[in-house]
Amino acid sequence: MSNAPLKIGLGIIGFGTVGQGVWKHLAATRRNMEMRLGVKIELIGVCVRDPDKPRKVKIPRTQILTDPFALVQDPRVNIVCELMGGTTLARDITLHALRLGKSVISANKALICEHGMEIFAAVSQHGGQYFFEASVAGGIPVIKSLREGLVANCFSEIVGIINGTCNYLLSRMEKESLSYETALKDARRLGYVEADESLDLDGVDAYHKAVILAFLAHGKWVPRKNTLVEGIRNVTLEDIRRASDFGCKIKHLAVIHRDFSKGTMTLGVYPALIPLDSILARVDGVHNGISLTGDVVGTTTLVGRGAGQDATASAVIGDIVDAIRALKGAAFKFLTTEDLESYATLGSTARMATLEEILSRFYLRFSLRDKSGVSAEVYRILAEEGISVARVIQYEHAGTQRGTHTLSTYPVSEAAMERAVRKLRKLRSVLEPPLVLRILAPAS
């Protein structure tokens, strides 16, 4: 009887920053992993668009392919790492691999957000495995925490800084008194901004990640039309400074709230004011932080590197280890038919809250013509919508005949604030569109 270790073949599709990081660290740690897992890991090959493109990580030319389906169909490949990005070809490759019963590992949050239901169904139907820890918050094991370590909990709230680019920009603005434009220029130079900048700056990237967390926590796929998605383009250095006057910092957050008594759920991605003494307020730079509030554990906050080659490669390699254990029969299977039925049942217990039902405190900034009676017009509109003001800070701009008002409100509905802002925009005395930010007080 042979005692030869089980051979595990690995194929990587996409050899950009993350793919090269995975190959580099696997090559360095493979022997140690093999001894710990009792297997023989073979790096079968990588698939790229341009084999001749210069790359920092060098691999033998014989291990470079250009046909991803050929790599997936190679009988030696047990685990496919889909690290190419995009949602069209990546979807086709992923489904093809799963239908062959292979394990797929992905860092592709957009793909999961848009096609997760179809991909998860393919897992349950064909017996493959799908792992996606690297899709949310890079080196922070939040997906494994939701699936395993914190599985005993019903989560009333998940609040996270899950886009490192936005956090970097707001941190630089706050710490160095930089304008948004100057901070963004530096972020571009350092390679912190996606090629399609709207993914980071308009909240789309964070929305993709929040949808994944919402499904894992509550069993519900949340469409874009049922969410509040905003970026940070309208946040100014002036707002950063005024936030400190209210005892807060501005952070770009993903917020998932579940009201079990009402059967409602909300998902939002937006810049918000959070108290200076909260844990998330101290998460700066490109780091991520996620606070999860459960009925059993209370509030747990995970902080770490949310992006970058090494942090993401760490998550991918962690998934490779889980895939190997599953192939050996030493780990439980995830996304079985029973799992998906349980998620569907869980999701059916929650409906998305309406704007009238979503309550928040707000920060409101507007500039007024320096003229008698104009403030009264503003506060009349707020009163019409039932908006109670908690605090007001006013300051003048010498020689400009205008003044800026910043105020905080008591809790009021999103719908009421939306109506009030529409009315304020029509006032001739309001010199520029008002800025509205939410004020949160996370349990952390």
Regions found by a protein language model. Name each.
Residues 1-100:
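N-terminal glycine-/serine-/threonine-rich beta1-alpha1-beta2 phosphate-ribose binding loop
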Residues 89-100, 109-147:
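Rossmann-fold NAD(P)-binding glycine/threonine-rich loop
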Residues 104-105, 389:
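A short hydrophobic/small-residue beta-strand
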Residues 124-205, 212:
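Rossmann-like NAD(P)H-binding beta-loop-alpha module
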Residues 182-282, 286-289, 308:
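Substrate-binding/catalytic subdomain of NAD(P)-dependent oxidoreductase enzymes
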Residues 270-295, 309-310, 383, 388-399:
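Low-complexity, glycine/alanine/valine/leucine- and proline-rich hydrophobic stretches
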Residues 298-300, 304-310:
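Glycine-rich phosphate/pyrophosphate-binding beta-alpha loops
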Residues 320, 324-444:
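A conserved regulatory-domain signal marking ACT and ACT-like small-molecule sensing domains
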